[in-house]
Amino acid sequence: MLIGTTGCSTKEPQASSDGVPSPVLIRPEPGPRYPSLVQGSRHSNHAATAPAENAPKITAKAAILIDSHGRVLYEKNADARLPCASTQKLLLGIMIAERGGLSQPMTIQEPDTWAEPTKMGIKPGQAYIKADLLRAVLVRSSNDIARALARDHSGSVPAFAANMNVRARQLGMYNSHFTNASGLPTPPGQYSTARDLSKLALASARNGFVRDAIRTKGLYFRFPDGTTKPITNTNQVLRSFPYCTGMKTGYTNAAGRCLVSSASYGGKNVYAVILGSKTPNVWSESEALLRYGLGM
């Protein structure tokens, strides 16, 4: 059994009707819905926002806080180009979900497993439902699954990275460049900004599958041999702050600690991005930004 999570199901996983196993989700407690969101623009007006006296102190290299209309509530070095680690898997999630066919099986190939940790441990020849793989990568950030989904989508990881750059521009992310699906530092030349990632956060909130996955606190991942692996969401704010509605973590030595997070309270939705934190303060600072945006 997975950790005891209030209000969450702990049913044992069952195989799907077509013989390809599926995980059993540990469902998050019901939370507020997101309102309609507006898409970012290359020419959006984002003059520097002077933090109010009661704004939280952010020690990370860059940060931004926006509302559901893209209005900036706080920013610090929001246009600095920085590595963003696994937070860019939100873009992977959007692209895979938009392609569709999530109920279809896909078979793991040998190159999919050539990934650095964090890894789920999938093996060549194994078959999984795409939705189960995508949910796992958004919850636990598994790099081998990210490679598999990228290859299945575009034929290869480099081709998928090129498609990521196209989709990023469509979302208004004009100051980002991606070279792989996972956020790892190789190949080099990969970067984004806090402002661009805030646009990605809005797009993630608009996508129903991604929105549901990123607020999932934990799930059982089921392998084809029937064994299961309990995994918990890497986003600690999702567990410490009851109004948090999820999003995505990231960490590499080069990027430091990165976090895209969101929260909802009293009909208001806010989105915070922190890049380049060198301490575990990323969690408390993210929560502080969310509370500030919600007027708490």
PLM ranges: what are they?
Residues 4-7:
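C-terminal motif of bacterial Sec signal peptides marking the signal peptidase cleavage site
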Residues 9-60, 156-296:
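Penicillin-recognizing serine hydrolase domain
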Residues 69-70, 83-107, 111, 197:
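Active-site SXXK
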Residues 78, 133, 275-276:
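Residue-level structural signal for beta-strand termini and adjacent loop
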Residues 101-125, 216-222:
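Short, glycine/proline-biased beta-turn/loop segments that scaffold the active-site neighborhood
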Residues 116-149, 229-245:
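Conserved catalytic neighborhood of penicillin-recognizing serine enzymes
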